[in-house]
């Protein structure tokens, strides 16, 4: 299980203030190692199709990626990080995707709580601790139906499950949740109860 003394819902405004995010800014979060199995490329592609559907300047949505290396010289960057960066460039994502690098474990509850949605687009995942941590913080999760994630996330209750490597399906679920704050809050509450 998850340590609920460490991972619990923090009021979003407080969490956003702690991590330096403006209250109106909306964050979709990925936490994990930057490696091909994690499917971050799928998430970036989903974000790019999201940008087309929801041009909303009042409450800009961005994707924050925690894990791997922060902004380092390209030659020091892992191949996967360079590949993801190139996908961002090719899709003209601009500032919509932010690589935050590693973050201290004790700051993670603030990131989870500040996020509208946590996404785990993995191609394989034995258990999915990050999903459980986010849920304990009251954040709905959209995850691939792989390994333990299919069991952890109750589709339509605590979040959504989507096929892996399917940016369109992921984009559709992101749009639904981003567009419906009541549904997000309800799923978040159920997620926290479940965790």
Which role fits each region the language model picked out?
Residues 8-21:
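A short helix/loop element that forms part of the nucleotide-sugar donor recognition site in Leloir-type
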Residues 22-38, 44-47, 63-64:
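Conserved donor-binding/catalytic core segment of Leloir-type glycosyltransferases
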Residues 76-103:
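Nucleotide-activated donor-binding/catalytic signature segment of Leloir-type glycosyltransferases, i.e.
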Residues 102-103, 110-115:
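Short alpha-helical donor nucleotide-sugar binding micro-motif in glycosyltransferases
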Residues 123:
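Aromatic "clamp/platform" in nucleotide-sugar-dependent glycosyltransferases that forms part
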Residues 140-143, 153:
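Short hydrophobic beta-strand element within catalytic cores of glycosyltransferases
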Residues 155-156, 160-167, 176-181:
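Conserved acidic donor-binding segment of nucleotide-sugar-dependent glycosyltransferases
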Residues 169, 176, 183-195:
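A short, well-ordered alpha-helix in the C-terminal region of glycosyltransferases
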